[in-house]
Amino acid sequence: MKKIICLFPFLLAACTTLPTSSEYLLRGDGYFKDGHAGKAVQSYTKALKLNPDNLEGYASRGAVYFFLGEYDLAEADFLRVLQDNPYQVDAYTAYASTLAAKGDFENALSVLNLASGLKPDKVEIFFSRGGVNFMLDRYEDAVRDYTSVINLHPAAEVYNARGAVYMKMGKTDLAEKDFNTAKTAKIPEKLNIYSMVD
């Protein structure tokens, strides 16, 4: 009995040093930030083995899969998030980006339209939808989406994107105006969409 009692503190200490699902998520975030995408995927997968209901783990792993060009795996992870939380707007935009990367622009547009119905003032949705509309040669819709972004959070990359649409439409004066605004205005160069995550 004394042996069991003596071993108990060691067992307890060993249990407290085992990484949790949250710790694996943090490790994955660190690995990805440091440019080690493969290790990030491994950490997120370990987090999900410990807690298969951890939607943040699926979303994070899906983002890394997307970065790696593993679009089918990314799509599966984003769909898993949406299965459990159909109101997760960021998962819709990530899923739509995956569809667009696979060349499925019509379905990407449908997903983004659904997301905009859930959160009509989310800049990332308009920016993504503008790009999809551009790829579908729906230039008026692309201009409308990019203008919505500019009205909410002006950034040089959005002016450049809208300028590219105007060029395709043959509206070179408007295109030049947007390109010049992107160069000279005191606005951020890029949208910081990650600071807008819900």
For the regions a protein language model found, what residue spans apply to each?
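Structural signature of tandem alpha-helical TPR/SEL1-like repeats
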Residues: 34-43, 68-80, 101-114, 136-148, ...
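TPR alpha-solenoid repeat register
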Residues: 57, 91, 125, 158-159, ...
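Structural marker of alpha-solenoid helical repeat scaffolds
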Residues: 50, 84, 118, 151-152, ...
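Terminal, low-structured helical/coil segments at or just beyond the last alpha-helical repeat
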Residues: 15, 164-198
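Alpha-helical segment of the N-proximal tetratricopeptide repeat
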Residues: 20-50, 63, 67
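Residue-level recognition of tetratricopeptide repeat
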Residues: 54, 88, 122, 155-156, ...
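Canonical tetratricopeptide repeat
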Residues: 26, 60, 67, 94, ...
